[in-house]
């Protein structure tokens, strides 16, 4: 019996697929805890009663690799007293491209 599920929304098909998986899990009483602490995960967590919490990874100096979100985007919330608050006044996911590091990456169109 599955007691909880940790899903990487980017690997299962994105936000729409994440909502579908979460709905199915909720139907069977299986809470979903999104893997990785990025804005899309925070939005999915806060949009569902079936996600009790989300992972959070503090930003620290690391080699560039899976930590692209640390460098490529700005605007992610910082937790206060163990909680994250999403700003309702910012468009989309609430993040923007960080121009400071943009030239460090090759952008393919």
Predicted segments with their positions:
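C-terminal extensions of enzymes
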Residues: 64-109
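Shared catalytic-loop signature of beta/alpha-barrel
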Residues: 1-83
């Amino acid at each position: 019996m599955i007691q909880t599920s940790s899903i990487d929304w980017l690997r299962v098909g994105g936000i729409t697929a994440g909502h579908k998986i979460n709905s199915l899990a909720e139907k069977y009483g299986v809470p979903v805890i999104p893997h990785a602490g990025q804005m899309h995960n925070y939005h999915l967590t806060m949009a569902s009663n079936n996600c009790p919490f989300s992972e959070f990874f503090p930003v620290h100096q690391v080699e560039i690799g899976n930590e692209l979100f640390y460098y490529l985007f700005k605007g992610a919330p910082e937790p206060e007293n163990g909680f994250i608050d999403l700003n309702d006044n910012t468009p989309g996911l609430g993040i923007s491209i960080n121009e400071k590091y943009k030239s460090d990456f090759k952008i393919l169109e």
